[in-house]
Amino acid sequence: MAVRIRLKRFGAKKRPFYRIVVADSRSPRDGRFIDEIGYYNPIAQPAEIKIDVEKAKKWLSVGAQPSDTVKSLFKKEGIIGNSVSQ
């Protein structure tokens, strides 16, 4: 089972709010997920990011691959360095 760390969209039209979730790569964007590890609110000024660092590191250690957007959020929060390969 390929596991991805990605964003699950919530919020109203043109007012997105995202939860950072761990999900099977085959499930739909807003479908079933395995674990929720945080949230991201791009509308707030500055953008609001809350990530459970322990859960994120645990999932990365067992092989979960972050999406490009989640990878950039992890870099902003200092969870991963710049030398992480795909």
UniProtKB/Swiss-Prot annotation:
Q: Which InterPro entries match?
A: Ribosomal_bS16, Ribosomal_bS16_CS, Ribosomal_bS16_dom_sf
- Record-level GO BP terms: translation
A Pfam family of the record is Ribosomal_S16
Question: What are its GO cellular component terms?
Answer: cytoplasm; small ribosomal subunit
| Keywords associated with the record | Ribonucleoprotein, Ribosomal protein
Keyword Ribonucleoprotein appears in the UniProt entry: yes
Q: Which GO terms describe its molecular function?
A: structural constituent of ribosome
Similarity comment: Belongs to the bacterial ribosomal protein bS16 family.
Entry's NCBIfam families? S16 (TIGR00002)
HAMAP family cross-referenced by the UniProt entry: Ribosomal_bS16
Protein name per UniProt: Small ribosomal subunit protein bS16
Q: Which organism's genome codes for this protein?
A: Thermoanaerobacter sp. (strain X514)
